[in-house]
Swiss-Prot record:
This is Translation initiation factor 2 subunit alpha. eIF-2 functions in the early steps of protein synthesis by forming a ternary complex with GTP and initiator tRNA. Coiled coil: none annotated. Disulfide bonds: none annotated. Signal peptide: none annotated. Belongs to the eIF-2-alpha family. PROSITE patterns: S1. Heterotrimer composed of an alpha, a beta and a gamma chain. The keyword Phosphoprotein does not apply. CDD domains: S1_IF2_alpha.
Length: 275
């Protein structure tokens, strides 16, 4: 079970918890990411409507996403709320928890290869990476995208080769793909050649940038689709803007017309390309 680097959760933090005991007035829950820590959820924090029977909402052994509303480390008290968690927040937290589980499994594999136990791995790798990146899997993604050197200085050097091997094999790098369409016309005998040359130059120039992939697809005159894959949405938008400006300039100088038609972004995950 993945655990956080700090001893206590912070107020406002979302946590994954397992219902331990249910009473008429509230419930006690174990905090999965904080071993040995127990939180209390008053019946008034279970739902936004009046709760006649708390067991209609909570049962022993059930896993929930709760919001931490009060923390008193001196007394060891942690108060939780279920009603203050939106469906979107719940979904995002569960995804984060799954990423932490995957990071934990990968770190266990690395520790096994080095002949270390997980407590050593947790102290030497998990804690510093979480403190720097916020979550360990985000650090692994950064290493997958930019090279294992990004972890240097945060973890002992002996971990780097085995972490590189595992990250290269198992870590998926999230990418954003956006697409749009161009309507391009050049009323000249060599109009098709002018359009083709403009698209190829724009594509090749963009593809020289790291982690950028641009592809054009002919949809039938006068329409052309562009697909841009980048590490994040903002970079993809920046590339599209640069390409559009270049294409519109070249086509206009050639006496033609070009119009950019936008579409929605798509998010996908791809395996890191081997270098």
């Amino acid at each position: 079970m993945p655990r956080r680097a700090r001893e206590y959760p912070e107020e406002g933090e979302l946590v994954v918890a397992t219902v331990k005991r249910v009473h008429n007035y509230g419930a006690f829950l174990d905090l999965d990411e904080y071993p040995g820590k127990e939180g209390f959820m008053h019946i008034s924090e279970v739902a936004s409507t009046w709760v006649k029977n708390i067991r209609d909402y909570l049962r022993e052994g059930q896993k929930v996403v709760a919001k931490v509303i009060r923390v008193d480390p001196k007394k060891g008290h942690i108060d939780l709320s279920l009603r203050r968690v939106t469906q979107q927040q719940r979904k995002a937290k569960l995804q984060e928890f799954k990423r932490a589980q995957k990071a934990e499994n990968l770190l266990k594999l690395a520790a096994e290869k080095l002949g270390k136990d997980f407590e050593e791995a947790w102290r030497e790798v998990w804690v510093p990476l979480e403190n720097e990146w916020g979550e360990v899997y985000a650090a692994f993604e950064d290493a997958a995208r930019n090279g294992i050197e990004v972890l240097k200085g945060y973890v002992p050097d002996e971990w780097l080769p085995v972490l590189k091997e595992i990250i290269d094999s198992y870590v998926e790098v999230p990418t954003v793909t956006i697409d749009a369409e161009f309507e391009i016309t050049v009323p000249k005998p060599n109009g098709i050649e002018i359009i083709k040359e403009a698209l190829i130059k724009a594509r090749d120039r963009a593809n020289q940038e790291k982690d950028i992939e641009v592809k054009f697809t002919y949809l039938g005159a006068p329409r052309y689709r562009i697909d841009i894959t980048a590490p994040d949405y903002y970079k993809a938008e920046e590339v599209l803007e640069d390409i559009a400006e270049e294409i519109l300039r070249v086509i206009k100088e050639a006496g033609g017309e070009a119009t950019l038609l936008r579409k929605e972004k798509r998010i996908r995950k791809v395996k890191k390309r081997k270098k």
